[in-house]
Amino acid sequence: MIVLVNNRDSFVWNLAEYASLFDRVKVVPNTITVGELRRLDPDGVIISPGPGHPLERREVGNSPEIVLEAGVPILGVCLGHQIIATAFGGKVGRVKPRHGKASPVKHDGKGVLRGIKNPLTAGRYHSLAVLEVPREFDVSAVSLDDNVVMGIRHRKLPIEGLQFHPESVLTEWERKEGLRIIKNFVEMSRNG
């Protein structure tokens, strides 16, 4: 089962729909505790997009603790990606707003990006981005039009973040590349 932590974004249900094609999905509020989450015994956790700043507790709930303590594979999308970065000591700041914009994204073809078109046209909906990557992470993807970090991956733990939205129609819809990214995460979660 995949647990999707809901940070109150309109894209939450698109992510849930994508993931449900490959496994059972339970959507939970971001106020769920790590203990409550562990009792659900998920194979993996998706930290959803949402409005606001990753350091604003009222907007992200217990998402940072989940990232650090859940002990299962984690994928963060947009705000979820930023939460991963800040939870591990990275910095997030303002960038030129990219709401409803598609950008070419070059990636390393590993992890959730395995087998994905490169460069990938990806849907972006953000005005914040990771400016300093935590030292335990590698940059896995970068936008080619403005050189913004679009993906990070922990060097040892199964934790990845994507600034772009794989569930957006702007992300290679015809080729189903966003769907493949979510499938890769579900498979990675099942395999531990």
Swiss-Prot record:
Key words, A-Z: Amino-acid biosynthesis, Aromatic amino acid biosynthesis, Glutamine amidotransferase, Lyase, Tryptophan biosynthesis
Record carries keyword Amino-acid biosynthesis: yes
Disulphide linkage map: none
GO molecular function: anthranilate synthase activity
Gene3D superfamilies according to UniProt: 3.40.50.880
Glutamine amidotransferase type-1 domain segment(s): 1-192
Catalytic activity: chorismate + L-glutamine = anthranilate + pyruvate + L-glutamate + H(+)
UniProt xrefs under InterPro entries: Anth_synth/Amidotransfase, Class_I_gatase-like, GATASE, TrpG/PapA_dom
Pathway: Amino-acid biosynthesis; L-tryptophan biosynthesis; L-tryptophan from chorismate: step 1/5
Annotated positions binding L-glutamine: 50-52, 82, 127-128
GO biological process, any: L-tryptophan biosynthetic process
Enzyme class: lyase
Subunit structure: Heterotetramer consisting of two non-identical subunits: a beta subunit (TrpG) and a large alpha subunit (TrpE).
PANTHER family: MULTIFUNCTIONAL TRYPTOPHAN BIOSYNTHESIS PROTEIN, MULTIFUNCTIONAL TRYPTOPHAN BIOSYNTHESIS PROTEIN-RELATED
Protein function: Part of a heterotetrameric complex that catalyzes the two-step biosynthesis of anthranilate, an intermediate in the biosynthesis of L-tryptophan. In the first step, the glutamine-binding beta subunit (TrpG) of anthranilate synthase (AS) provides the glutamine amidotransferase activity which generates ammonia as a substrate that, along with chorismate, is used in the second step, catalyzed by the large alpha subunit of AS (TrpE) to produce anthranilate. In the absence of TrpG, TrpE can synthesize anthranilate directly from chorismate and high concentrations of ammonia.
The protein, known as: Anthranilate synthase component 2
Organism this protein belongs to: Thermococcus kodakarensis (strain ATCC BAA-918 / JCM 12380 / KOD1)
Gene name, Swiss-Prot/TrEMBL: trpG
